[in-house]
Regions:
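Conserved histidine-centered catalytic loops in small-molecule metabolism enzymes
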Residues: 46-69, 111, 136-155
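Non-DNA-binding regulatory cores of transcription-related proteins
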Residues: 93, 97, 102-129
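Short, solvent-exposed polar/charged micro-motifs at secondary-structure junctions
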Residues: 81-83, 154-155
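Glycine-rich phosphate-binding loop signature in dinucleotide/nucleotide-binding domains
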Residues: 42-44, 90-94
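Short amphipathic alpha-helix with an adjacent loop that forms part of the alpha/beta core around
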Residues: 83-91
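Active-site-proximal alpha-helix that buttresses catalytic centers in soluble enzyme cores
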Residues: 2-82, 106, 117, 125-128
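Domain-level recognition of soluble alpha/beta enzyme cores
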Residues: 116-143, 150-151
């Protein structure tokens, strides 16, 4: 299975706003569009998306402009790497996109990619970070295709 692990794009951070309802910032909206264009140029075509039910993750998915089915899951909101892995294992699809939050999405990405990635921002996993891998039954069968942050896509 092809697996795409994406941290939501940059969100607004205003005092007093409930975390779950935070929207994307203008930068985050542009980043989601840029990532969607990158998906298209690389022929990354998710057949299913599992997305946290927070506003910023939903908006990140919508910004990608993908046509795949999507499931907005409350269980992915601030999910641990273990919870994310559990949801991924339930999915039976050819190319799965998961959009979630740090630290869980970053921890899972680091576990699956191992030491194969030398990108200077990989361990920070900033907003919009996206890892694309071929996932086998266990971590030893995983190979990295690509990793990008929104900053990598600015021309």
């Amino acid at each position: 299975m092809m697996l795409i692990l994406m941290r939501h794009a940059e969100a607004i951070s205003e005092f007093g706003i409930d975390d779950h309802t935070r929207d994307l910032s203008g930068i985050g909206q542009r980043a989601a569009l840029d990532l969607g264009r990158w998906f298209a140029t690389q022929n990354f075509s998710p057949t299913l998306a599992l997305v946290s039910d927070s506003n910023r993750t939903k908006q990140s998915f919508l910004g990608l402009k993908l046509s795949c089915p999507v499931k907005y899951l409350p269980s992915l909101y601030l999910a641990t790497a273990t919870r994310l892995d559990s949801e991924i294992r339930k999915a039976n699809t050819e190319c799965l996109l998961v959009i979630a939050h740090n630290p869980g999405i970053a921890e899972l990405a680091h576990t699956l990619a191992g030491k194969d990635l030398t990108h200077p921002r990989f361990y920070a996993y900033p907003p919009g970070s996206t890892l694309v891998i071929s996932a086998g039954k266990d971590a030893r069968e995983t190979s990295v295709h690509d990793f990008k942050t929104p900053e990598d896509l600015i021309s």
